[in-house]
Every structure is written in C-alpha cells, then in structure tokens.
C-alpha cells in the first residue's frame, strides 16, 4: 500500500542482517525481521494469504549520550503486504486488501500497521487507518498480542473500504468542485500546494482509462498517483491528511 519512493528496497531475507540497537531500561527496539515474521504468522492465522510483498529501509540516527550521534543503517522500515481477496468480505473490483508496516530503531516513529488497499491498474495506495502496535515491547509474546489487536482493527477497517469506494465512485464532480476539493486536500496537508495543478492534470487527463469518469474516486486516485513521489514517511502523513479532507469525509 505504501509506495516506496526515496527508500532502499530490499528482500525480506535482507531484514535479518539489519542490526538492532541494544535495549535500554525504557526502550526496547523490535528487530525488523521479528515484526515481519509475526505479522505474516498472525495474518495467516486469520486466513489472510499474502500475494505480494515489498520492503524498504532508510538510515536513522540515535542520540546515545549528550553530543553523541550514532548512524544506524536500515533503522527505518517501511513495508507493504498485499492480500488475496478475503472470503465473505466484499471488496471493490480492481483493488486488493493491503497492509503497510512501519518500524524504527531510532525512535523516529512507533511500530504500526496501516490498513488500506492497492489499486491494481496503477499500483496507487489507499490508506484507511493507522494502528499503533506499541511504542515499546518487552517480549515476543507482547509483540504477538499487540499485532493481534492491530490485525483485528485492520480487518474492521478493511470492511469499510467497499463503502468508501462506492461513495466516491458515485459522487460526480464538476470541474469547479474538483478544483476546490484538490485545494482542500493540499490545505489539509496531503501534498504540497505545488502539486495542485499536477493532481488536476492527472484527474482531467488520467493515465488509466479506468479513471476517466469525473468522480471523486477518480480525483482520489489522481491525488494518490501524485503522492507516489513522496517519501514513505511523508506518504503516511499525507494519507492521514487526505482522509481528513472534505473529499474523503463527505457523505
């Protein structure tokens, strides 16, 4: 679901080679490989079958003592797991359920699971919600329990995606309304003001014929297409802002 621009993409096996900093009395970083393995295991227990996966890392920095900074290779993990259709759960055609992962070894952000979807024709991401697994862990048992809670919330969030798709797909937009909504998305922080015209250009002349309809769903995808160029961290903030904008909130 996350689009991994500006990060170094790596295979799952490479995550095992990324060192994890030593824990302290108040903070225990979670190895990236443990996060991915536990999420895969617990998702499988729910009948979620992974169809594709991508992982990317960025370096980070840890302040160990006053005036001392240590660079940590691969400290920030971003991942995306796409799942096969879920039995008994309606999902829009041309989309697949998807989960994002964020984890850091430099305290830059908490371990979290992101729920959403991927639009197959263009690989655009759609983020519905973010669930913080935990800000610190003491054992693998705690990690498993926390991931289970996050996956429960993920499943509930994914159930609502069909309604979002139907609502946006049935909302016809005039050119004036589309322009106003795009400005509001930028104002909410989904993307910068310099992206307003490129988003409108993609909406009016879409790269994929599936989005030629003048609907809010087409505009949403024009926005997320532009957001592919953002860094993974910025995308999470951007999606969060996008979901508070009038486009996603209107009933």
Predicted regions and their residues:
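N-terminal low-complexity, intrinsically disordered segments
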Residues: 1-63, 69-72
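Intrinsically disordered, low-complexity regions enriched in serine/threonine
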Residues: 2, 69-251
């Amino acid at each position: 679901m996350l689009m991994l621009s500006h990060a170094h993409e790596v295979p799952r096996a490479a995550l095992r080679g990324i060192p994890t900093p030593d824990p302290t009395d108040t903070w225990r970083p979670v190895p990236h490989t443990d996060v991915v393995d536990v999420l895969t295991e617990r998702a499988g227990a729910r009948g979620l079958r992974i169809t594709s996966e991508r992982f990317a890392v960025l370096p980070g920095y840890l302040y160990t003592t006053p005036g001392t900074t240590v660079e940590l290779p691969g400290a920030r993990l971003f991942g995306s797991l796409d799942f096969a259709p879920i039995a008994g759960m309606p999902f829009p055609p041309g989309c697949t359920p998807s989960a994002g992962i964020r984890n850091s070894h430099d305290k830059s952000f908490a371990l979290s699971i992101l729920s959403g979807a991927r639009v197959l024709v263009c690989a655009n991401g759609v983020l519905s919600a973010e669930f913080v697994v935990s800000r610190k862990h003491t054992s693998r048992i705690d990690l498993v329990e926390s991931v289970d809670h996050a996956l429960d919330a993920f499943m509930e969030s994914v159930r609502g995606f069909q309604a979002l798709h139907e609502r946006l797909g049935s909302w016809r937009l005039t050119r004036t309304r589309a322009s106003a909504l795009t400005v509001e998305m930028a104002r909410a922080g989904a993307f910068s003001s310099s992206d307003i015209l490129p988003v409108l250009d993609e909406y009016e002349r879409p790269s994929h014929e599936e989005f030629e309809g003048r609907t809010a769903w087409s505009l949403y995808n024009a926005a997320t297409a532009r957001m592919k160029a953002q860094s993974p961290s910025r995308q999470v903030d951007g999606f969060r802002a996008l979901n508070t904008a009038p486009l996603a909130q209107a009933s």
